[in-house]
Amino acid sequence: MSVSSPSSIRLHLPLVFVGLPGAGKSKVGRLVAAQLGVSHVDTDDLIEKSAGKSISQIFMDEAEQGFRQREIRAVHQAVQMGGVISLGGGAVTSEEVRDALRDVCVVHIHVEHDELVRRVTKKAHRPLLREDPDGMLRQLRRERLPLYEEVETIRLESDDGPASEVADRVVDLVDLGWKRIHVGGDAPYDVCVGHSIPVSAIVGALRSDASKVLIVHAQPLVTKAREVANGLETMGFEVGIATHPDGEAGKSLDVVARLWDEAGRMKLGRADAVIAIGGGATTDTAGFVAATWLRGIGLINIPTTLLAMVDAAVGGKTGINSSAGKNLIGCFHPPLRVIADLDYLSSLPEKDFVAGLGEVVKCGFIRDTEILRIIEGTDTNLLSDPRSSQIRELIERAIAVKADVVSADLKESGLREILNYGHTLAHAIEKCENFSWRHGEAVGVGCVFAAHLGVVRGLLTDADVERHVSAFSRVGLPITYSGTSFDELLDVVLSDKKVRAGQLRFVLLDGIGNAATYRISPDEARQVATRLGIA
């Protein structure tokens, strides 16, 4: 169905380009895919790859009927990839192809006859058209124009201007269904946030010469990993799959060595990549493997927990544990892309989902106060629903906070320390409780503790403390702690990485939304602990 007013519709993936020879389908398709950050495929390329011979050789060996059957299969395969697709000019002559495009967004690039003749006359690889471009194009237009009009979602006119202008017009009409949050710095990348993000978003971030990927995941995610692998294999990639023990047990040198062996077995090259599917333990471990194999290859993070989406998977930190402590072995290795598909959250245990909100609330206090306003103005039932629009906005905003901070300070030399708001005490609670407390639960207590320290320092008011208590409570997180003694907690705090020359250093707020690091005396910390009933 043709749409007369382009501005009245929104396009979505998969996105198919059709048109006569010379219309610019492949060039515009590549430009659009690059701007959207997804894969592009030309069905003629798929046909040649699967057949192992050129299009002209297929016509010689199998005649047009054999080629069209291959083309039908290629179109179905391309549509399943969910990216940008450029069809051969005659593909729509097959009824099966037209049927496959019924529910797909199809852009018909229409070019006036004289301009089309000018274009194809310059193309040395079109011998048939070169003999009589005017007559042949008139014939093709008569035969195919009704078929293009049958399948088109929208028709765009192309003149003698650059293909980039047509591509820009298409991109303006596309609704990806997900948001891209940019992380800047020396190694920039995007975080894609939304539902049902297709495999084309993974491929769009890989190097153009990548041919192999190693998927690393925890055992409970074997089905999800297989789904991703199937999609990548459909697109021609060699895929290896490796599991690791769930949780912190997977962050060991033995596990990493086994993953290195798998990378070696696959002969992963510099152009290839590791894909991490899982929570923070997976992104930490797989990221370290990617950072160290061949001194660094590509990494795609697909976090499946809320905590990993808003924290571990974004920022470029990788690491494993040792007998000396957690995350002491690692390096900074930014990913090529992060795919935060919110569909994964629907199967996340409720306690893990709630704990992940701890980092979200923290981001509201240190940087984006709109997060707090959303939490304060949203029904608590919606705050516990992973599919609510409010949760999606909260996640997007929390990721944007981290992206903004990491863009300015990847290696935690200054600004990035503000992301540790609430973490000094939180890490101590986690360790003293043998990690039976979830990270986000401990962060809630740690932020309330830090807010009280802010009052002692004259940086915050009692009302600001109450706002902390209310925000963390509304999402279901604890705001008090009555476990081990404060002396035991203090011993752990004194070993915190932020301690300098025996001085405690806490991230505090000088007003909501304005975080910085302060030196705190043990007496000040004890005063607050006593006030909160931590003996």
What is each residue range found by the language model?
Residues 177-273:
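ATP/NTP phosphate-donor binding region
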Residues 288-380:
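A glycine/threonine-rich phosphate-anchoring loop and its flanking beta-alpha core
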